[in-house]
Amino acid sequence: DYLNIMSENGVTLDHFDELKATNEIAFENYTSLPPLQAALSLTSRIFELEPVHLIESEYVTENFDAELILNVLSQMTPESVRIYHVGPDEEINRQLQFADGGYRVEEIKESDFINWEKSEYALAIPVAELIEDDESASVEMLAGYKTPQKVYSADGVQAYLSHTQNFSGKESTLQIGLISELPITNLENYIASGLFTVMFIQKNRRFYQRAYKRGIALDPSPDDQGNMIFRFYGRSSKQIQYAKQLIQKYSDFTADERTFKNAAKILLDYYEGFDEQDISDQLDWYTDNAIKRPPNIYSKNQILNALQKFKLEDVEAFKEKMNQSIFLDIYGHGLFSPEEFRLFASDSRKILGGTSTIDPWHLDDNFNVKTGTSRMKKVSIPRDGIGIVDISIYPEKSLEIFSQFRILNKLLAPTFFNSLRTDQQVGYVVSSYESRIREYPAISMVIISDNTDLQSLKEKIINFQYGFAIALEKISEKTIEGTKKAILDEMNQKPENIYVESGGYVYDWQQGNYLFDTQEEVKKYIASSTKMDLVDLNNSMTFDGKLMNINIQLKVKSLNNSDFFSWAAMSD
């Protein structure tokens, strides 16, 4: 039916002009990908197009040819349709050769076509939109906005603004946080917040699409505490206008039973199918859960049990309380006018109404690292393979130590990969990375493998750590200085785009560090670190046990004869 409607009413110059304007904006706003991603993206089409047209081919919309379009539509008949469905409970009659699973193929019956024609859905062609040339007057880069500055502050709202130092300002990024302590207070609020987020996203899809056609990507998603963050990326000229409209939609939002049921099903399906996700994703989730790092502080069973009891009125009651406690936290980067930004912050606070949260709120972290202790989480999963993540957490909240961990991992990571992946072939994923866990510096080592011996994997990690400590003492000062220079050169290079340029500031804004100095402080600590600093730090952990160990182990349930790692089973 819809194909017929398209043929009769959808092939119009107005719809073509909408597509053409959308593609022109997308081409003008083209952002280059990192080198490897760009290479993979371009080579996928290299046999179909001339190399000179590989990028622009997706955006070229030159001539409207109704006859050509109708000719293509005429070939799209119901009889030629192919339907693909993926699900855990489908009947199969053919096994896959190189993977676990199977499939079936069946003909679509004539009765199916007849039933589909009886559909009660009302189909219609969307009205063509006029995508106007909305370039606003340019704003000059202001000297005082190289780093974020507070441009507005009042009860229940604050706004920070910085100006790009490397780009024209045609593109910007805008972050709007609707912040309250309520979502993370208890399990019921956490569930209500998640349901509301999904409901709001589902209900406003057309709005996101309308913004996207005008060169603005919009990502409404929760932060680690379950609070809604509206993130805008793309053309600067209309971002504030769309942001105001979205805040108004949030303020006015009411849900119906159907939207609630859809949201509940999405979350139920996610958690019920969680064990089938990639092992790397499960390792991340169980790591957070082991140390109670938001948002993953509740077990899957707790979440599923709570979800099954929830009703629409529970979400409505939560939203009413939430609306009365929102602190509006705003950060923008690009070339927004400070005056326009102040007015936007003030108007947005008025849209949301009064609040009991006058000052910025950030979660108080009561996590403690206890030297010489270990936490283990052992999980049996249905999918094949095993995974282990072994984390060494330093027992002091120190940005200096974290900076030194960055140097250590720059030396450690390739050696760890070469030793356990290339030489010993213990897994198909072998990696390490530095991070901050609840503000404590940490180094994590990850192995994902078909090897079923978790005891052996953990012992290999321990042996590697001892070997690396000995090798570190023999590394030359020249190698250390070269490693530091490589890290600093990477940090100081011109960012690929405005979103990378603002990334460090966005991180500080989310953490409540309104000095916005984390990146610069890390650079200073890296530059001043010596070989002796690194050796002493590494030895204090490896030989003196100045750390807390977090160990997460996953293995397929069918491997009954394969043991999890335990300290008691350590070989001499």
Residue ranges: model-predicted function:
Residues 1, 169-210, 247, 267-270, ...:
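Active/ligand-binding-proximal structured segments within catalytic/core domains
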Residues 78, 169-173, 213-215, 225-227, ...:
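Extracytoplasmic
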Residues 178, 232-236, 332-334, 392-394, ...:
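Short beta-strand-to-loop capping motifs
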Residues 14-166, 283-370, 376-382, 395, ...:
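C-terminal regions of mature proteins
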Residues 93-94, 185-187, 239-241, 338-342, ...:
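Short, conserved charged micro-motifs
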